[in-house]
Amino acid sequence: HLDVTDEKTRELQAQYITDYFKTSSYPVIIGGDFNAEPNSKVIKKIMARHWWDATDSALTFPAWEPKVKIDYLYARPQKGWRVVRTQAVHSLLSDHLPIISELEYVRE
C-alpha cells in the first residue's frame, strides 16, 4: 500500500520496493494498492525499471462504483510472462476490488 496523499512519498516507496528486488535471480511478483493511475509518475517509473504490468485495465476503485485503476500486480523480469487470466472481483469487503491473476512464466 503506497501513500494515499503524497506523490513524492509514493515515488520513494516504489523506488525502495523496486530496488530491493533489482538483483534477485528469481522471478518476482509484487502487488497491491499503489494509489496511482496508469499515467502517473510513479507507475511510469516502475515500468521504466523493467517491471511488467501483469494486470489488464480493470478498474478497481472505489469498489462500489469502480472508476479508476490504482491496484496492480507487477512482475520481474519484464519478459517471459503471460497472463492466463485476470479479473477484478466484485466485492464490498474493501474499498478496492481485489485482483486475481493466473500468470505463467517461461524462463528465457
Question: Where are the regions a protein language model picked out?
Answer:
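Active-site regions of metal-assisted phosphoester/phosphodiester hydrolases
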Residues: 1-108
